[in-house]
């Protein structure tokens, strides 16, 4: 369960839709395969304008996308990765990217212009979400189960101590 690959791309608004797309920053974590090429040559051209979408790829992977104002925020995940978590990841990188760069900087950027300045941020966010990828509801249930386990262990320790005291009483 992980985010394998992510990118931020900009469509050249002067040309026709999907004809001239610039990948401004991309990052992959332990990805084996030609995901970057497939994404740039095929997937980016299919992303609908001003929409959120999912694309299954070979039943093992899912592309998650957000397209707003000529920018596409995309990540590729294992099929088992929670969809809500992937979209939260995309919203967070969109927010960080928009805070770091002015609209003018973003709209004038050339291909891979922001790899050096934003690639590390993108990679760190991918690592964070890969380590904390549980659906928020599952994470809450897991925390509650751990708290319950701690209480039960404390109760068992108390019972064991009382058992020893009872044993001493019976012997005397």
Task: Indicate where each model-derived feature is located.
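Soluble N-terminal interaction domains of secretory/endomembrane membrane proteins
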Residues: 1-161, 167-168
